[in-house]
């Protein structure tokens, strides 16, 4: 269940991804295991899954199966790491365990997450790492563990090793450090690729078993981390918060909601580490980046990495982190923002994402997660950017982009770094980045990976140095992009990683090659993207072009932009990945990308495998990502659009710029852009939308260029995009435009790029960093920088390059010296703080920049304001701040102040320049101080205070500045920037505005252009500033439990709620708030971007406290609330694009799964402890075609029997078509032949038989009947019929939990009377048995067992068993009970059902042939042609020996009911209606006749009473007479009638044998068939109706009902209504499954006359006899022929069909046979009958007109017989039914009279049809035999009696070899294990059921869903009732004491399907009246049409009514 929950959560967030994820997860073992929830047993396989994923990684290196690989790749690490827990996780037990906030919980969670990853939630470990502490944590844990090791050694080497080991974990061994690293990176890449990972994040939400993670996260993280985050990030956060307070809040809100839900909830499972990862990352940097750095770099790197990355901050930092998170939630800009800032930055970017996130959130949190990841990416890039970068850099420094696409190669270098810092970074960063990557990070990763990969490309050329340099460069560039800290971190990671990069680059490149497919395939990203794309498809198209342009251009900006582009692109990539997932072409494109990447890699690979493959892939992926991202972005609303637009503008601008100084400027811009775009991507993705709008001309030009690139690829978009990007990156350096030559030149360019990158790898990286810093810092300048500063950027770039070089050197040093790196990592993390802040700033800045690009003004203002806070200044400032805070706290404060002042004074550009200088200084400081910072990790907290103050100061200054700026252009720009940050839509408009300015224009121009959007931004800015101030105030002043709700007026409508250190950002606000809060921005924002909530801000925190899931966006929550059945875990595998259970069968692995049958044998031998012949495995094939008899009852076609006494265990396995993964073969059934001792079995048989015979109370079960409810498979004698008895606890829909929720003293083994001794005796038997069976269950299906005992201690009252280990909650004893095919949908998910069989004494010896036996059938499976070992001969031998008995079509007598058994609801409804009708009829009836009629109808006809009564009124004469006659008749046939009544009551058709048979044949059979015609005569019913009029049985066949109805309406209106009724009646259950189309068609009529319809049914079967006698069968005939498929027959009946049918009607059996024949062969007997019927019909019409009533009166005998039948049938149901039937009869007669056709005929027809349908093959024979009797009116009686004996040969099921029906013959004492929830199963009917001496007793042990609450859920119920009472009180207060809730009304609507009939009665009655008023219509009898539709001939005056 927990897994289910996870799935639900996953479904919530990953729902879309679940499917894509499954492909990812279906990587084989993991998929299988995780899906099965039995990862432990298959831990090796889960490992294998990880390995497989690794193998997939490895084997899939070049394979585009990255989808599976992605998750898989991520999975391996986690899988390995979490092997111990995988089982639990899979089982879901650990998930809960993991929900512990403790680290151990975290570790468990990590491991669990692994499992989850295996479950498909693990797939996105990277993302999951943030989201899924388990998953994210898992890698995180792995990383952290590794990181701890690496951190402890603080050696990037160790990091690498750890990463490698992590990878190895992924890879299944540190044997391939490179591969492992690749694996890890790929895993991360997979994570990244897993845009699915986004899902993971979402899954993280899923994973969390509650708010545990929340608790952990909040508990640990928020306190310190929040403060630190606030202090460190606060400046950024402040600025960002100001900028993106809304967006931040939005991000936080959405992310808080999602993340709290997700991460907190997720972390629940993941111990909150994921939150920590995001929060931690965010927070860690806020902690001071140093903390993060320390955490990442130092052992803390391990812990921080682990904790921080894993939201550890989760266990160790969790309080802080959560506090930070809370704080972040509280204070958008505060450290919580770290996560949330990352989130917020993402939020800023994701503001759009937020708005988008609304979309994203709406998509199920996927997008949101994506956004979150984007946010986190931003946060990650900003806050966790270090981690992300580091982790991304270290793990994916080259692979950040690469990791998405190039992840495998580039991440290798970074992997090394990642382990120490990279790991923590990776964990934090990668986790966040992964989260981002799946969301934003995916984009960022793509870009970053691209950037890094690109930078790695040069390293590629000089493998180690180049990679080294390249990695640092990408790292730096990415860090700048992501964060200053990130830069440093990345540099650290990059530095360390780069060396590894060269080594690992190739593997990673290979991996990347695979990863890109993974990336491309990332289903989750794709899903997110898809979701986003749906929202943003247009934007995506634009954004894609833009992004492509951007990508094309960014390749020039390769380093900078790729990172950001990756930020952007990854989103796009996610989007595109989603697309890919959606569009197989996309994965192939992505895969193609990898190929291009690989090719490029091969070219560039020489130098840097990572770079070539990685860069191309990055470029490609970035493009892809951008494309996808664009899709996502656009999906992500404007956030991505703007970011894209910005990026595109940036790209456009940087295109030349890129081309100008591709290495430097381009890299920086690109990285910058990417970084910004990444962050801003959320931001600017909206901006992109806006940009697209604003910059559409320029952008479009760019995009057109890109489009030329991109669009050539639009599907290959990703592929080309990436190469374009690379080419663009290369080309820009080549100063050739990306768009045109990009793809061609991409490879070369990639090489060139790589060379260039190599040439400027560090410079670019450093420049990127510094330029990012300066770019960010000098955003205004750099805004122009892209344009005007492109030139200066060259120089600047070089300066930056130098600075970057220093940083890079430091990074390299860090890389070289783990401790140095750790220190640097710390510094980087400090930088991350700064960088994250800066990144936030960068993001904002780049968002600003891009907005500038897009909306020239925005960038400057943003630069000035937001840029300063979010972009350059925050980045610089933050870097500065972080470093300064760390190094120069006071200096930072002064600098910050100065910077703020400067920003204020200097307008955007000067401030930006200052910021850039500072940033450079900071970069230098960072570069050098980074190590110090790493060393001065401890400094970070103090610096945090300083930073906090500085941040506050800065925030205030920035506020002022922003205000000032807002007033001028800066103001508008800033506000716009803020707005974009705040409001994605706002950004989007900015993006549009940005779009307006040429992207190539200088940033200044862009900034100016951004000014116009400022108006909107001003509002937001103000709110952001206010919010920031409030946040600061709250943060500083708020008491721990002070709760405030801040409503930010951002597009996202972020609500910030703070309670002490916990800040909850909710994006959801009321629509009114939305309207009021985001006037300008909201106007800009699309409605999709708005996520109004019904909850007030104040309630959010409370709700969160109550349940984190309540914080989820509504769409996500709805997903959570959706039934589990649709959210099964699909393991990710590469075998198929999408798992279609309809085709391959249900997928689950908790009974066992393996790659082949031999593996299953190994598993089962290991479990069972015996080998060889003791275990028998049979292959079965899923066909999806249900084998059943003509009546719809179970049949067996193959019987698998015990072959010998040596055989102890039988295992049925299904080979999943098209799968070669670890779950290619799954176990679907396990049968232990000797399950319990025979002595015990004997004793239980006798004891249970005796007890249940005397005291048992039958349990009505729907599966007791066929779909028509007409079979008597349980027997007809209520005293002996088969029955089921339920004991123990079961699920109740009323309580949504245990049915004993309100019981003070629940009697779980309740028997008749009050005999506690008997109950105790029975209980002891069943408790002992359940205790005995549990160990067997545990041994044979450990995964399912573990799933079922997960909550044993929580809900002991709902468990059976006397010892520890109680998997069962209830048991059902079935005695000779024929269970029709069904699934036990109420069972818990990932559990199974155990059936203990006890047989009669004559069936206990092996080899004996019992007189009768009951088989357990799987109706959808057929036996394989080969045996376990693939031998056809051996299989044939089994068939010869009897081990497999092949059955053939055999005739057998079947028991059918005269009419369908009514449901309890119907019976209640009828009784209720009868009473009501009685009163109304007494009051309103003007005639005694009416009164009499109404009274009987009221009493006997509840549903149809009113209609029948009205009809009777219309036909009063006939009505009363009919009633009278019917009444007497019921008396006559009372014996059968009571039986029938009993039968309906018991819902077991066995009671009324005679009446049942007659009724059944005449009416019941037809009724059900009309309702749901059986294979033979499902159509006859309709046919008849149709035939009567349309006489086109074939056509009628299809539109039977409608035709019948239409025909009736047309030819005989009265008939029509009645046929409608008849059809309706037949349709009554609306079972048209068997093809009773007529029922469907008639449904309108049925609906209209449903009450009558039923009576007609009842009437019908009674009328069967009477009809034959009455010669009313014309309509009946029509029905039958049509039903029988005899067109000519039907046609005949149309003219004289009534008569013919009448003949049929006369002997319902005969008629049925006719019909039956008609069904089989159109109707030769029918023809004979036709003549007969024609005569009868001829006679009948006279009868019909007057005789109808006369008939009812006069033909008392026939009618009386009919009535008798009717009475019996009605009696069966109720007297009211009886009356109703009579009325129906009257009505029928009336209609008939009106139509000239007796309505009784339709009834009879129905009867006949039913009989025929009922599989009255006998009737066919009987038809011949009874034709004469049919001719005779009296013949009907015998016919009705004959109906009792219906024969079926089930021939149709045997004719088609693909129709299933594999049965096993359970023996005495055997135990059968199967997943009854997922597999359709049945038990065959017995020849002579006798529950007093049963042939078989089956004791079914199960555990229902939601049986996990103590005391049967009493507390929950009481709370629910209290809530209802409170609501009632509120309603009373609101509406007054007299207010009555509309409860009953709603129920009435549900309960009273008859009411609609009443409503239609007026029409119906009017119709009948009008028909009756006119002359009888002459039915046409010679109409035979071969057309699909019957020609309805309407004759008579009433045709005008048709």
Swiss-Prot record:
Effect on the protein upon substituting residue 1913 to D: In myelodysplastic syndromes; refractory cytopenia with multilineage dysplasia and ringed sideroblasts; somatic mutation in a patient
Outcome reported for the amino acid change (mutating residue 1290 to A): Reduces enzyme activity
Residues reported in the UniProt entry to bind Zn(2+) 3: 1289, 1298, 1358, 1912
Effect of residue 817 to T: In myelodysplastic/myeloproliferative disorders
Compartments, record wording: Nucleus; Chromosome
Crosslink (Glycyl lysine isopeptide (Lys-Gly) (interchain with G-Cter in ubiquitin)) position: 1299
Consequence of substituting residue 1262 to A: Slightly reduces enzyme activity
Effect on the protein upon substituting residue 1396 to W: In a myelodysplastic syndrome
Positions contributing to Zn(2+) 1 binding: 1133, 1135, 1219, 1221
Consequence when changing residue 1302 to G: In primary myelofibrosis and chronic myelomonocytic leukemia samples; loss of interaction with DCAF1, monoubiquitination and of 5-methylcytosine demethylase activity in vivo, when tested in a heterologous system
Effect annotated for changing residue 1261 to C: In a myeloproliferative disorder; somatic mutation
Protein name from the UniProt record: Methylcytosine dioxygenase TET2
Impact reported for residue 1261 to L: In a myelodysplastic syndrome
Biased composition (Polar residues): 126-143, 267-283, 479-488, 703-718, 935-944, 1081-1095, 1496-1507, 1554-1568
